[in-house]
């Protein structure tokens, strides 16, 4: 069936204007009667609670129980049949049918008021529960009140909103007309709640760190810049909370986490939005192996508690969170998925450059061997990491805040978690050698001064904090939006962010 959209600017402009004029006239009449925007209606139930409690009972039982309810919501459909009507009312719990008759409401109210209301109006009802001959749970209304007059019509709920631009820009319409979208965002909330509950049970403390920062740090990314008038200085929207969180570990907290927004002045894609939600945690007296185990247990718990299963569908994949996650080093993964690349090729810079050029990677002369390995991995290997997989042994060159590996200082004690072919999390044993950290930040600042906008600033305050002593610590960051995409079988990040970043309408 062909789907239509009543907000199509070409086909429906004239019709929309007519509806607006009609509804505005109705609103003006209501204003004259003093019957607009009532604010004293009290409900005692929402729709899904009624179905849970009374959905299995027959009509005779409901008559005996004489269940009186007060409920409010949006009128999304109605059938007027002479002196009786059926209305579908929608609230946060779902939908329920109303039965209205001139016998219960009086002829004058039914004809002069109710019949003139419109789809989209918000109503409050008092009435008795019963079941129709077809067995549908229904409220027989003895009073119905117009709470809010809707000036603009809602999209046809049967056809829904096809235009994704409208879904993203006017999310409220998407939520009204698309039950799946409404439930997706409820699931998102449940996922975040479950993360908090899991970490609370593990004795973590939730903290808050600055979003406006004098220097952005904690990740390699281009920041957003703003200006503080009173202080006469530039400030940056944070790209990561990491450096502040580690200062709290220095201050004596031993298990902390933060769930908040990060901002990166970068491109948009199916998996990237400039404003996104991140969970970061830090544990004193732990290493990256401990954090990998915690990550696995966290995701196992989330899938089980929120979705009711550890095996979930994502596109054509069945992702299994019940087993131990796969572990591979970056080099092992590259060689496994690129049979023409041998481990020895990745150990020699010239051979690694040849491998990179053969697969279309443009080599920057400033890159070292570690960066070249990482570029090869990102271009050829990430997309194959479908089941939950920890990739370890990242080069120190691309890990400026991570601890060097004791056995091979070329590598960092770091991992990234990949699921469905995309990075979901990043963790490592934290670098607490202040001299090593200072040297790496100096190197990052030098790269930044040469024109790389994504490299880090040198943060003297953080180095001073490190000099007071950071205990052995490990950390983890998980992108909440990408995690929600996986767990709701969504393939575009804009589908899981209520109000995604959009280009200005022309």
UniProtKB/Swiss-Prot annotation:
It catalyses: tRNA(Lys) + L-lysine + ATP = L-lysyl-tRNA(Lys) + AMP + diphosphate. Binds 3 Mg(2+) ions per subunit. Its cofactor is Mg(2+). It is an enzyme of class 6 (ligase). PROSITE patterns: AA_TRNA_LIGASE_II. Its EC number is 6.1.1.6. Its main location: cytoplasm. It is found in: Cytoplasm. One of its GO terms (molecular function) is tRNA binding. GO terms for cellular component: cytosol. Mg(2+) 2 binds at residue 423. NCBIfam families: lysS_bact (TIGR00499), PRK00484.1 (NF001756). Homodimer. This is Lysine--tRNA ligase. The lineage of its organism: Bacteria, Pseudomonadati, Pseudomonadota, Gammaproteobacteria, Candidatus Palibaumannia. The gene is lysS.
């Amino acid at each position: 069936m062909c789907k239509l959209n009543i907000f199509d600017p070409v086909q429906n402009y004239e019709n929309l204007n007519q509806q607006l004029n009609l509804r505005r006239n109705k609103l003006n009449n209501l204003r004259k009667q003093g019957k607009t925007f009532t604010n004293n209606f009290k409900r005692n139930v929402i729709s899904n609670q009624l179905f849970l409690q009374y959905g299995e009972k027959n009509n005779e039982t409901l008559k005996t129980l004489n269940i009186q309810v007060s409920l409010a919501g949006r009128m999304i459909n109605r059938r007027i049949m002479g002196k009786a009507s059926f209305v579908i009312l929608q609230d946060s719990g779902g939908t329920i049918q109303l039965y209205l008759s001139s016998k219960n409401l009086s002829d004058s109210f039914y004809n002069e008021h109710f019949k003139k209301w419109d789809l989209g109006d918000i109503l409050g009802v008092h009435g008795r529960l019963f079941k129709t001959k077809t067995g549908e749970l229904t409220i027989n209304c003895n009073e119905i009140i117009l709470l809010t007059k809707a000036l603009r019509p809602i999209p046809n709920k049967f056809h829904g909103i096809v235009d994704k631009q409208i879904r993203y820009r006017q999310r409220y319409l998407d939520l009204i007309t698309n039950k799946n979208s409404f439930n997706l965002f409820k699931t998102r909330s449940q996922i975040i709640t479950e993360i908090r509950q899991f970490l609370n049970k593990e004795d973590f403390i939730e903290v808050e760190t600055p979003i406006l920062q004098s220097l952005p740090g904690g990740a390699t990314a281009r920041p957003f810049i703003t200006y503080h008038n009173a202080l006469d200085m530039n400030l940056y929207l944070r790209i990561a909370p990491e450096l502040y969180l580690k200062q709290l570990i220095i201050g004596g907290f031993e298990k902390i986490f933060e769930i908040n927004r990060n901002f990166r002045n970068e491109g948009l894609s199916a998996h990237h939005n400039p404003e996104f939600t991140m969970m970061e945690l830090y544990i004193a007296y732990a290493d990256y192996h401990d954090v990998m185990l915690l990550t696995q247990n966290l995701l196992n718990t989330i899938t089980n508690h929120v979705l009711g299963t550890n095996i979930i569908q994502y596109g054509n994949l069945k992702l299994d969170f019940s087993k131990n996650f796969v572990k591979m080093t970056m080099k092992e993964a590259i060689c496994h998925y690129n049979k023409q690349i041998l481990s020895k090729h990745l150990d020699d810079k010239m051979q690694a450059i040849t491998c990179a050029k053969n697969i279309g990677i443009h080599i920057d002369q400033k890159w070292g061997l570690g960066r070249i390995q990482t570029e090869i991995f990102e271009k050829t290997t990430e997309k194959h990491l479908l089941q939950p997989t920890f990739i370890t042994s990242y080069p120190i060159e691309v890990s400026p805040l991570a601890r060097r590996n004791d056995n091979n200082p070329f590598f960092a004690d770091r991992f990234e978690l990949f699921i469905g072919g995309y990075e979901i999390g990043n963790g490592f044993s934290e670098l607490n050698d202040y001299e090593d950290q200072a040297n790496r930040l100096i190197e990052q600042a030098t790269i930044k001064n040469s024109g790389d906008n994504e490299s880090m600033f040198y943060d003297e305050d953080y180095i001073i904090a490190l000099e007071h002593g950071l205990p052995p610590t490990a950390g983890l960051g998980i992108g909440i939006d990408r995690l929600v995409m996986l767990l709701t079988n969504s393939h575009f990040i804009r589908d899981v962010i209520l109000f995604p970043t959009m280009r200005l309408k022309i």
